[in-house]
Amino acid sequence: MINIRTLRKLNNNDGLTLKGGKPITYKSGWQVATEGKETRDINEAMRLIREYKGNCGVWYSDGVYYIDKSHRVNTKREAMLIGRQCQQISVLCWRTMGLAYC
């Protein structure tokens, strides 16, 4: 599992994806969030990561940690369907690291 030092190292508008509490990247597929929470408290961010069992995305922007429960799917179609059902703004394409807006 990552620790607070990992979160402190995030620059503004920086993030990472976790699987089982460890940073991970993929060469293909799509990452989609099903729910999320935000906090300015780094200890609360760690609590949320543990609550999601380390299967989440972490984004840091302007002093706020965004913690999203997320998972990888194979197709854009599936990612967009889940994203829309869960009222997400966008999904991430691993191949290009670009966003597709729901």
Segments (PLM) and residue ranges:
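Conserved, structured core segments of small domains
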Residues: 1-102
